[in-house]
Amino acid sequence: MKRTPHLLAIQSHVVFGHAGNSAAVFPMQRIGVNVWPLNTVQFSNHTQYKQWTGEVLAPQQIPALIDGIAAIGELGNCDAVLSGYLGSAAQGRAILTGVARIKAANPKALYLCDPVMGHPEKGCIVAPEVSDFLLQEAAAMADFMCPNQLELDSFSGRKPESLHDCLAMARALLARGPRAIVVKHLDYPGKAADGFEMLLVTAEASWHLRRPLLAFPRQPVGVGDLTSGLFLSRVLLGDDLVAAFEFAAAAVHEVLLETQACGSYELELVRAQDRIAHPRVKFEAVRL
């Protein structure tokens, strides 16, 4: 019997709705991955609601929780770490300490860093030093980084002028250490208004993917968290990087179709669960 992969997911949690682990854990489980959720923050709801309550996990709690997993002899069974929203740079450094410990216990373990930053339209709040930490420290340890365009712009210190420029910016981030960059959402002058575009960039090649852009009165939150989680999960399940990239795009599109059909603001993960596991659509990644 094939072994089920285990993944430590270190990111935010909301009690109501879907963001961070609340967006990614169930879909990752649904496609066949054992997920160990470690919540960096616990908020009542995501921050696009403009008001929320909750608290940030103290940085020292992260290694303490990983110590607990090690104490029961399970740390070597961790096949990957996924990190997302950080409450502080100190929290990020605690995560990197945990990643190093897991990679020591299992040298084949992977680390995907989803470099969540502030978004002026979505009300996502991160501490100012988090951006520097992600670029200067996390990138060197990550196997994969999955920025959106806003985050890629922040890393590059500029906005792109073309798709080719986006590719150059992703390659510059790749040079800092990761073996692959997934740009979850491209935005550049001349991009088709009715399309949602993504990039996969490795040292050997690059791929561009386009799917239809669905309209919503208010854009759902958690789409990027879902994308990163599904991509990493499919890699753990044996997909090559391009297949995992294509699967993540298709499964996320299925969730958005269901969310749109229901007129929902929050992602309809439960209603779309069978389509997450077995997407009916397919989007081809085109090699550039």
UniProtKB/Swiss-Prot annotation:
Cofactors required: Mg(2+)
Leading EC class: transferase
CDD domains listed in its UniProt record: pyridoxal_pyridoxamine_kinase
Reaction equations catalysed: pyridoxal + ATP = pyridoxal 5'-phosphate + ADP + H(+)
Family: Belongs to the pyridoxine kinase family. PdxY subfamily.
EC number annotated for this UniProt entry: 2.7.1.35
InterPro entries per record: PM/HMP-P_kinase-1 (IPR013749), PyrdxlKinase (IPR004625), Pyridoxal_kinase_PdxY (IPR023685), Ribokinase-like (IPR029056)
Entry binding sites for ATP: D114, E151, K184, R211, P212, L213, L214
Chain's role: Pyridoxal kinase involved in the salvage pathway of pyridoxal 5'-phosphate (PLP). Catalyzes the phosphorylation of pyridoxal to PLP.
Protein name: Pyridoxal kinase PdxY
Keyword Disulfide bond in record: no
GO MF, one example: pyridoxal kinase activity
One matching Pfam family: Phos_pyr_kin
One Gene Ontology biological process: pyridoxal 5'-phosphate salvage
Binding positions for substrate per the UniProt entry: S12, T47, Q48, D225
Keyword annotations of the record: ATP-binding, Kinase, Magnesium, Nucleotide-binding, Transferase
Quaternary structure annotation from Swiss-Prot or TrEMBL: Homodimer.
A Gene Ontology cellular-component term: cytosol
